[in-house]
Regions:
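Active-site histidine-anchored catalytic micro-motif
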Residues: 1-139
Length: 139
């Protein structure tokens, strides 16, 4: 059994942003040489998420509105976490809702997806350099 690990680094220009990382993850799979196995992809930041969904702008806007309705950024004073001097309690809650990681089957050297599935990095407290871990195990 083989194992492959790589960190993907990128800059996030906005506080909240959804980035399609599927091409970078597929490149990792190609580099790994693994044809059958499991791929794990997780956010390496406590205020970010990795999730699978459709790459459609309207849906991304729906995510943004829905998450802002559940955990609005402001007023900062509404969150106990922000009493510590932070201003990102909403980002922690959004991450809890959207999840930390995805696990995808690898079949015949490809991500075993249906046609519309894509892997996204969801950032909820950005404007700086961020990273994602890709771990692939298989043969």
């Amino acid at each position: 059994m083989k194992s492959y690990r790589k960190e993907l680094w990128f800059n996030v220009s906005k506080r909240r942003e959804y980035i399609n990382i599927t091409p970078a993850v597929e490149e990792c799979l190609l580099e790994s040489g693994i044809k059958e196995g499991i791929l794990l992809c997780n956010a390496m930041h406590i205020t970010a998420s990795v999730f699978i969904n459709d790459d459609e702008r309207g849906l991304h806007n729906d995510f943004e509105e829905w998450l802002q309705g559940l955990a609005p950024e402001k007023p900062y004073s509404r969150y106990r976490h922000n009493d510590t001097g932070e201003d990102n309690a909403d980002a922690h809650l959004k991450r809890s809702i959207m999840g930390r990681e995805v696990v995808v089957a690898v079949t015949s050297g490809k991500l075993d997806f249906e046609p519309w599935e894509q892997i996204f990095y969801g950032e909820f407290d950005g404007k700086r350099r961020k990273r994602v871990l890709v771990k692939i195990i298989g043969e």
